[in-house]
Amino acid sequence: MRLRDLISEFDGFVIDQYGVLHDGVRAYAGAIAALEAIRAAGKRAVLLTNSGKSAAANEERLARLGIARELYAALVSSGEAARLGMEDGAFGPAFAPGGKVHVIGRTGEDYGLDRFPLQPVDLAVADALLILGSDAPRVSLDEYSERLKPSAARNLLALCANPDLLMLTKSGRQPAPGAIARIYETLGGKVAYVGKPHALIYAIASRAFAGVEPRRILAVGDSPLHDVEGAAKAGFTTALVKTGLSAGRDDDELRRAAPSAPDFALDGL
């Protein structure tokens, strides 16, 4: 079964980006056609991505891969959700305008820090941590642990704006920002999460489906723990696609990885 077989059954679609539409280098076969079919049916697709970057930066990347902006109604990134949460005061005074925050991410990556109302500083003088990306494999989890021990001892709050545990890279699967956040928790640090499977990003995505019952929205992703679990908690119908992080994994393994079983298992889009 593929996503295109289910378009007539639902009123809206929430679709993951990495591992579902593309692999970071090229769009998957059938991905563009599926978005075109949703649009032709007069229905809306919202792309929901655990990415510390802005929605605009993700849209630009998709365009470079041939996925045109007109093919989806909106894109919501976890980084964008974090910014909106800061504006609403959701994360407390440490992330209020002007807060001294140390940013964790990939070396040389542009996370558009000017969109956050914060003051980026060195780790030693930070009042909070903002985890936007991972520098793995250049920096190992053991090295992150050593770096973050003093921050945990100081009881600094960390905001993880990408809860993914694994990421697809040219060198294979590597620890993602969520894995760094877990390391910080094991050190005794406190972490707030924004992104799938947590509620805020789904609340933002739901704004594009005013008047649509949650069960009439099909959420499609490749991560049992993030895409399926988060969408199920939001009340959406769920579909796990066997690409990306789920490629090559048998059904029993996928079931063990998911607190909530998906409503549908898809071979592709």
Language model regions located:
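Asp-based, Mg2+/Mn2+-dependent phosphohydrolase catalytic module
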Residues: 1-17, 22-41, 51-269
